[in-house]
């Protein structure tokens, strides 16, 4: 009985948020489909992607989906999400194993965020302000992921992940500015 309850709970955790997102998207698009028809709505969508603002926003939304899926839905349940809160700072594991791919992965995962964020929202201004806004946005998105992982017991909460993710976002913005 307990096993069945855990299975039902796990199914809800894995499917509730994607289901809510899917339902929201369908309900948001429904009035347009009813008014213009499916074919005209699809044509209008692809036509809107010719506008750079729409294209970059579309790519940013795809990026958000991929990162959220990878960090929240593709993880196993963790019984102790707070087991290594202050771990993960070392860039090198040992002299024999080389680089820690988790650190590089965290930086690389947020690099597109910084680039797409600046292309979408800060394209007109290439300045320190752009870097600060991207830093804050990267920090907030990374903290959202880590806190959500903690709430739903997905992976382990680590401050180093937030720092390295934020660094990746800032590096993406630096490439935009250069």
Annotate each PLM feature.
Residues 1-154, 159, 173-178:
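Bulky hydrophobic segments
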